[in-house]
Design a protein with these regions (language model features):
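Short catalytic/ligand-binding loop motif for oxyanion handling, primarily in non-cytosolic enzymes
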Residues: 2-6, 48-52, 57, 180
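Glycine-rich nucleotide phosphate-binding loop and flanking beta-alpha elements
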Residues: 47-48, 122
């Protein structure tokens, strides 16, 4: 109940639907941070600049054809997907291989969404989130490096090399951990054709319309 109440509060204050469920978790986490701090550091941008989405980039590295439907299965959630938008975004990107094109996609499009999500969630709490990985000097330096240098033998390899003397090996090489939200439990969904992400999108639209008298 706290999750849904918080989500409604955020939609009301922002006057727009939320993008993904973990926006609510970021907001709640920031509320706790606000007890002692008004400025935080965030790691947004590291996965986009240093290719940290292992599952997607591994697929892109082994395919010769950037099939939008297949990419969509790795990238998007829910059953009601509009691949025309995704196809349009990918079409004009530079890059000769699927791997290169997706590298640009995540930096140009995906990262913008993450930064907006972070900014919206933290500013609602009057907390400033700083993102050192998207400092323009670092972005410009990475832009001039080769795709081989960024990927190497594993993903985010440059970061691992840089920090290997500072951060313990078990942290550097641990399995990637997501930030999931148990939507099935939150919405108490029965077994049906409706996915939890479909229900989340419908919840957003219903509350957005209610707050804006649509």
């Amino acid at each position: 109940e706290k999750f849904l109440t918080t989500a409604r509060h955020m939609i009301d204050k922002r006057l727009e639907p939320l993008s993904v469920p973990n926006e609510v978790l970021i907001f709640l986490m920031t509320m706790e941070v606000k007890r002692k701090n008004t400025v935080v550091l965030s790691g947004e941008g590291a996965d986009e600049l240093f290719w940290g989405y292992d599952r997607i980039f591994k697929w892109a590295n082994r395919t010769n054809n950037l099939d939008v439907d297949e990419f969509d299965n790795y990238y998007c959630y829910g059953s009601n997907k509009d691949n025309e938008v995704l196809d349009f975004a990918l079409e004009g990107l530079p890059g000769e291989t699927p791997l290169e094109k997706l590298g640009y996609y995540f930096q140009i499009f995906h990262l913008q969404g993450l930064l907006r999500r972070l900014d919206n969630s933290t500013m609602l709490c009057s907390v400033e989130a700083r993102v050192p990985f998207v400092d323009h000097r670092l972005v410009e330096m990475i832009a001039g490096t080769s795709f081989d240098w960024k990927m190497g033998h594993s993903f985010k390899e440059p970061l691992k090399r840089i920090f290997k003397e500072i951060i313990p090996n078990e942290i550097i090489n641990r399995k990637k951990i997501g930030f999931p939200v148990p939507l099935d439990e939150i919405f108490d969904l029965p077994i049906s054709n409706e996915s939890s992400m479909d229900r989340w999108l419908l919840f957003n639209l219903e509350n957005f319309r209610n707050f804006n008298n649509y």
